[in-house]
């Protein structure tokens, strides 16, 4: 069985946005949920729009959840 990717969303930066990593690779800086989901889609994660962003065990939110940007 394939291991699920580890998604880490860093705390908001002082200038805005949050760095997003998947399995240690930086995908970019997201400025909102739309950016975040697009990064995941480009990384090959399918059906990301159906993830419960608040409680998904795939996502580690640091410095606030999906409503903090």
Regions picked out by a protein language model, each given a short descriptive name:
Residues 1-13:
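Short N-terminal "domain-start" leader segments
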Residues 7, 18, 59:
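A broad, low-specificity signal marking well-ordered, structured residues that form hydrophobic/aromatic
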Residues 11-52:
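Amphipathic, hydrophobic secondary-structure cores in small proteins
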Residues 42-69:
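Mixed-charge, Lys/Arg-enriched low-complexity segments
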